[in-house]
């Protein structure tokens, strides 16, 4: 392939713009492909999605279903053990996590999850621990301290 041999792909340049309302010879003259009269023939004539002509629409006839527990669920700052490994302190307290932006929201309690090997003798303080995190902490000879 050379520059003087370049060609457009067959059929890629043949699409012509529809020129509506420019005479009956174009195939889209007079009513411009919109049919005769009526709301849909007007410039802003389309009805909104789910409009049923004034009848109460289906989404309002069918009752609301289900329950969402978001308002009542206990929310936590989730901290992974891997994110704690890089800090070389012996005590990883909640205050330490808030100050170092490991846990973002100070209003929420901290939950430690995940599995990583901590230096032995490290004390991790949090409000809650996952089973895997507790197992990893005990396997690496560190301590988990549950806060109230």
UniProtKB/Swiss-Prot annotation:
Q: Which GO terms describe its molecular function?
A: rRNA binding; structural constituent of ribosome
List UniProt keywords, sorted A-Z.
Ribonucleoprotein, Ribosomal protein, RNA-binding, rRNA-binding
> Gene3D superfamilies from the xrefs?
3.100.10.10
For bias type Basic residues, the affected ranges are 11-22
Q: Whom does it interact with, and what assembly results?
A: Part of the 50S ribosomal subunit.
* PANTHER family hit by this protein: 50S RIBOSOMAL PROTEIN L15 (PTHR12934), LARGE RIBOSOMAL SUBUNIT PROTEIN UL15M (PTHR12934:SF11)
From the Swiss-Prot or TrEMBL record, give the protein name: Large ribosomal subunit protein uL15
- Organism per entry: Ureaplasma urealyticum serovar 10 (strain ATCC 33699 / Western)
What gene name is given for the protein in this entry? rplO
